[in-house]
């Protein structure tokens, strides 16, 4: 028997450990990629839902104001979801963040010099804080019937 051929018979323990380590690393990388993909997909879905919801909220505000719901020198609570008839989707919270008033030359938070224009910032955010979308609306005081604005 040739002693050289005995050493080349099969895998050694070291070769098996290296192969196992390489395969383990590959599995960890693949699983990590899948987990990251699922997390990114979840955030994107929540952003899309929040974006659609904040636009619905903005439409409710516009309808509310058009129906003479405009409040001079309003606080954000005047345009809260409950005040304008908006219900946020399950797992989301809607808020009226800020109202600023047009002074004739600039937007200001106070003192109130409301000349019929308000800038309202509204937000819809997921309750797990992964996604939030904001919209800034400019509200104009509607003219009454027969009025020349």
Region roles according to the model:
Residues 1-11:
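N-terminal leader/signal peptides at the extreme start of proteins
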Residues 9-13, 92-93:
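N-terminal segment of the canonical double-stranded RNA-binding domain
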Residues 11-55:
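Aliphatic-rich helix starts adjacent to a transmembrane/signal segment
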